[in-house]
């Protein structure tokens, strides 16, 4: 009986020690460092309105249905963060072709002046998470005609807005040139006032 107790005692102590270290101490240290070094990112890169209410995050896409605003990427999960992920079909999968064809038809319905050959791929395909907040500058530019007609804002102003909101690759190396749709639409909203 004593031998069992002598074997179990260190096992229980080690288990409890690692439970406290990995489940409490480490997360608190990492959270503290994140809050000190990059508070905005640690809090989810939230964007607030004039009333200090959260209206979105720079990191999570939103579904903009009003045709006066720029539209983001297609999301098979309807931008529900708790259901993150998409059906990442292989290029040879017929379901991918059907989904893209449906996305093109939906997009053409809202933007009849844009030829199918000029629709950027990021407007008719999902991102891996289904929550991508960014589109390419070209994807924003092809929407200028529609938005200009609906808002009476000159195309030149809208193109300048896109240029002002365009972000380069991270550190000049990683990723593509992109436009955050939420930030772009907030800037557009200021022009509409």
Swiss-Prot record:
InterPro entries: KdpC (IPR003820)
Keywords per UniProt: ATP-binding, Cell membrane, Ion transport, Membrane, Nucleotide-binding, Potassium, Potassium transport, Transmembrane, Transmembrane helix, Transport
GO CC annotation, single: plasma membrane
Pfam families documented for this protein: KdpC
Transmembrane segments: 14-34
Keyword presence, Magnesium: no
PANTHER family referenced in this protein's UniProt entry, alphabetically: POTASSIUM-TRANSPORTING ATPASE C CHAIN, POTASSIUM-TRANSPORTING ATPASE KDPC SUBUNIT
NCBIfam families per the UniProt record, alphabetical: kdpC (TIGR00681), PRK00315.1 (NF001454), PRK13997.1 (NF010601)
Subunit text: The system is composed of three essential subunits: KdpA, KdpB and KdpC.
UniProt record similarity statement: Belongs to the KdpC family.
The protein's name: Potassium-transporting ATPase KdpC subunit
Organism this protein belongs to: Bacillus cereus (strain B4264)
